[in-house]
């Protein structure tokens, strides 16, 4: 019996109890949940449903809890149901009902935890989208890890996810990048408002290798050559770094194409039709205040040049024409103002603003020996994705960046995350998987096979705790996906790894010496196989490897 199964039983039982006592069963919440008590002595699961219902149906919550407990204890699979406090019900599950979870996990394999919650939904997930003016910095690296994990997570719930990178190759930053490349190619210092770092000199040299006569071209041709070739080279490097980090995209959209293809003009024309556009002081404005923004936004500046939001409008319209039900934008800490702006843009274009979700990520800091690490050899001023991977590896980097809620700034201690110790969270989880893999190999050598035929023998409290936790995995994924919080998966895995290590220390899995393999060994091996599967599934969602040996 999984937590989801128990919740369904609880809801059905509560409906019957309410009807039996002449109370309104319509008061039942759409979703009924059970929780694991912090203190195991209070039971396997607990519910506050009677407290939720008491006032709504005009019943004393504790009395209602008593009726509910009496009805539940009569159900198959419920060993005990006790009333606690003002109206809580603590539940204990019969081992025979609980232990079937082990067989369910083994049968489902790599699909365990998946659901059809988002079947039929087409989701556009745009993340990283860094300017092609330098390597991916540490903030963008956080999005590369979290965005990829979120895409995997949404896919487990049935969504069709398209990962998209919006290539910001339009605007003043590209001009500054071009000027920096030309200066480096000429052996001159970087412009005051330009970009520094050895990567600029490297790309300038590559431009000259591809176009040896670039510096002799007329000025306009020279600039266009360095711009076009340099941007492509930089973006190739960005894509290579992301690929090696385990993050790939389905679609790359060029911002410049929004302007050159006429899609910006089309979006503005559509807004004129709806009356959402007006002119003032020689500029073209969008009435975003009509849709919740704090001020109207300039779309076309007084000099005739499009403002940044013009591209955003065209881009959103382009996404909706491609048939996405939901567009998720993952932006940096300095983009809070974009939330209302993007939602207002969607509404102005005649769409539901709830089809737009904006996630804002906070800063990432690196620490070594208690001191902040601020300088990159490659980029000159910022820490890059490649710097982080060089320091602690892909697995540790991804895990460290995913492990905390994106709205929380994080410090990454390079010494901790590169250590082979239980204090290193990714090592702790991966070691559990490696330990389980070694156990499976040793069992094979002894001729002992996992078997679910005698799961009723799993009665040790550490076995029960481990089984209940692997039963939580589908609910963890469902919650993490609905809240867009993949960090919940990593925290769950750490908790599960802890339960496994404690089980292993308390329950001998394999026969020793001349001991004959028995049904309990086979049942415990099945529990280990299920635990190993859940850890592998969870690490896969995070894009982190599940090593067989460590």
Swiss-Prot record:
Gene3D superfamilies assigned = Arginyl tRNA synthetase N-terminal domain, HUPs, Isoleucyl-tRNA Synthetase, Domain 1
- One Pfam annotation reads DALR_1
**Which GO CC terms are listed, alphabetically?**
cytoplasm
Q: Which family does it belong to?
A: Belongs to the class-I aminoacyl-tRNA synthetase family.
Query: Which source organism does the UniProt entry give?
Result: Mycolicibacterium vanbaalenii (strain DSM 7251 / JCM 13017 / BCRC 16820 / KCTC 9966 / NRRL B-24157 / PYR-1)
User: Which EC class heads this enzyme's classification?
Assistant: ligase
Listed under subunit, the entry gives:
Monomer.
Q: Which PROSITE patterns match?
A: AA_TRNA_LIGASE_I (PS00178)
UniProt superkingdom: Bacteria
GO biological process terms on file: arginyl-tRNA aminoacylation
Q: From the Swiss-Prot or TrEMBL record, what is one GO molecular function term?
A: arginine-tRNA ligase activity
Q: Is Nucleotide-binding among the key words of this record? A: yes
> Which HAMAP family is this protein grouped with?
Arg_tRNA_synth
Its Enzyme Commission number(s) read 6.1.1.19
What is this protein called in UniProt? Arginine--tRNA ligase
């Amino acid at each position: 019996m999984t937590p989801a199964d128990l919740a369904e039983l609880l809801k059905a039982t509560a409906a019957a109890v309410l009807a039996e006592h002449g109370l309104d069963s319509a008061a039942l919440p759409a979703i009924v949940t059970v929780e694991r008590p912090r203190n195991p002595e209070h039971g396997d699961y607990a519910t506050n449903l009677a407290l939720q219902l008491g006032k709504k149906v005009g019943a004393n919550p504790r009395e209602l809890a008593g009726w509910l407990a009496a009805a539940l204890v009569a159900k198959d699979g419920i060993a005990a149901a006790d009333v606690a406090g003002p109206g809580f019900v603590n539940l204990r599950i019969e081992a025979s009902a609980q232990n079937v979870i082990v067989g369910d996990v083994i049968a489902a394999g790599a699909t365990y935890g998946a659901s059809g919650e988002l079947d039929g939904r087409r989701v556009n997930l745009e993340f990283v989208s860094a300017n092609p003016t330098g390597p991916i910095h540490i903030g963008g690296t956080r999005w590369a890890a979290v965005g990829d994990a979120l895409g995997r997570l949404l896919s487990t719930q049935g969504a069709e996810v398209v990962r998209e990178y919006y290539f910001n190759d339009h605007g003043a930053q590209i001009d500054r990048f071009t000027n920096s490349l030309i200066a480096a190619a000429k052996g001159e210092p970087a412009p005051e408002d330009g970009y520094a770092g050895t990567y600029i000199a490297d790309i300038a040299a590559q431009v000259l290798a591809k176009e040896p006569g670039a510096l002799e071209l007329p000025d306009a041709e020279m600039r266009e050559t360095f711009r076009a070739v340099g941007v492509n080279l930089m973006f190739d490097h960005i894509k290579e770094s992301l690929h090696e980090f385990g993050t790939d995209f389905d679609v790359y959209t060029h911002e410049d194409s929004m302007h050159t293809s006429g899609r910006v003009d089309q979006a503005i024309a559509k807004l004129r039709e709806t009356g959402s556009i007006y002119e003032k002081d020689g500029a073209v404005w969008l009435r975003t205040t009509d849709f919740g923004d704090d001020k109207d936004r300039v779309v076309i500046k007084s000099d005739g040049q499009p403002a940044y939001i013009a591209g955003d409008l065209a881009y959103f319209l382009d996404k909706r024409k491609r048939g996405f039900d939901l567009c998720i934008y993952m932006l940096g800490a300095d983009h809070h103002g974009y939330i209302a702006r993007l939602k207002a843009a969607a509404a102005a274009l005649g769409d539901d603003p709830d089809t737009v979700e904006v996630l804002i990520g906070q800063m990432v800091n690196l620490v070594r020996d208690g001191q902040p690490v601020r300088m990159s050899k490659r980029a000159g001023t910022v820490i890059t994705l490649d710097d982080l991977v060089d320091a602690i590896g892909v697995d540790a980097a991804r895990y460290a960046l995913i492990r905390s809620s994106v709205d929380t700034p994080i410090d990454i201690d390079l010494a901790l995350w590169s250590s082979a110790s239980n204090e290193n969270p990714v090592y702790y989880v991966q070691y559990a998987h490696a330990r389980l893999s070694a156990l499976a190999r040793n069992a094979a050598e002894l001729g002992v096979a996992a078997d679910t035929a005698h799961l009723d023998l799993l009665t040790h409290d550490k076995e029960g705790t481990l089984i209940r936790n692997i039963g939580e995995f589908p609910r963890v994924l469902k919650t993490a996906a609905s809240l867009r919080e993949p960090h919940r998966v990593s925290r769950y895995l750490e908790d599960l790894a802890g339960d496994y290590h404690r089980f292993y220390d308390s329950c001998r899995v394999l026969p020793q010496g001349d001991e004959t393999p028995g049904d309990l060994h086979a049942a415990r091996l099945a529990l280990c196989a299920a635990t190993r599967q859940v850890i592998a599934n969870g690490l896969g969602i995070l894009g982190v490897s599940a090593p067989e040996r460590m």
